[in-house]
Amino acid sequence: MNRSLKGLWCAIATTLAALAGMPAASAHDADESLRAAIAQAEHNTPPGRRPIVETHIHFWQVSRPGGVPWPTPAEGPIFRDILPGDYTAMARANGVVAAGIVEASGIVEDNQWILDLVRQNPFYTFFVGNLEIGAPTFARDLARFAHDRRFVGIRGYLTGPAEGITLSPAQMTSLRDLARRGMTLDLISRGDKNPKAQVQALCTAVPDLRIIIDHLGGAKGPAPVDATWELEIRRLADVCPNVYMKFSSFYDMYAPGDVVFPSPTELSAYKAHFDVLMTAFGADRLIWGSNWPVVTLHGTYEAQIAIAEQYLAPMGVEVRDKVMFKNALAFYRRHRP
């Protein structure tokens, strides 16, 4: 491994660990550490690129005893072992300086499997786990995984047949526990799955919980933009300052599900919806992510990054860097011990 690159990844990992649970008296030190990591990232990024922090990738091993609940054979090309060796070199070549993993499985022990899988690899700096919010074992499971500082939050598969937000007493207890620990909540909100009105109710009920809506908030192409979707997006962004939007999985706008389908690679196919998200949430609340390897069902990793870079370029390097890496470093960290 190139020594300077290894130093970069170690610096970023150290920065995130230092930021996690940082007491107020040490805020200045945290800021200095973050600035140093950003500077080193910029120095070591491949020529002609700016740094990227990846916030949404998945690993799984279908060949393990018992397999995995998802993907299934129906997902075709991604129903195979997907491990760090499949991703790391490709990501580095595309300017990714650090990556966060999102757990795709609802099996509690699979959270530990991921943490163990990348324990010795500082390139993978944070992990969004998967626990059933509202489950009787939630508090115990969260306390267990919270001992690992890389465990920064939870993916929002919530109790109920539709994995929906009910704000039941059990869910509220779990969500407040998450907020109390300074962790984050990733949510899918599209169609009947966690409708925007329910996300708004959640953000109001737990205002100190940082929430991020994955994959463009369920945007669907082509233009013109659906008026109801736009209204709901703008209302949510306005009412809920604790809600962020993941600028991720662009190809979903056209794909009919997790099946092989060639989505467009031209910015023009996405720009109208991107504009809604940018004007609603602003550059401070958009966070890049890919949804690799799922995106490979519909297009290439490189092309998706190119779409993002092309869209952000006219807005200047400050906006680009916020969306593509700086916002991620601020959002995906533990704000309390």
Regions flagged by a language model, labelled:
Residues 4, 9, 26-53, 78-98, ...:
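Mid-to-C-terminal alpha-helical segments outside catalytic/metal-binding sites
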Residues 10-20:
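Bacterial N-terminal signal peptides
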Residues 28-173, 177-181, 193, 268:
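Mid-domain alpha/beta scaffold segments of enzyme catalytic cores
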Residues 31, 152, 165-287, 336:
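Catalytic pocket-lining loop regions of alpha/beta-barrel enzymes
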Residues 56, 114, 154, 178, ...:
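Conserved, mostly hydrophobic/aromatic
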Residues 67-75, 260, 302-308:
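Short glycine/proline- and charge-enriched loop/turn segments
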Residues 86-90, 110, 141, 174, ...:
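Alpha-helical packing segments of well-folded alpha/beta enzyme cores
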Residues 106, 133, 158-160, 189-193, ...:
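Active-site-proximal loop/turn and secondary-structure-junction residues that shape catalytic pockets
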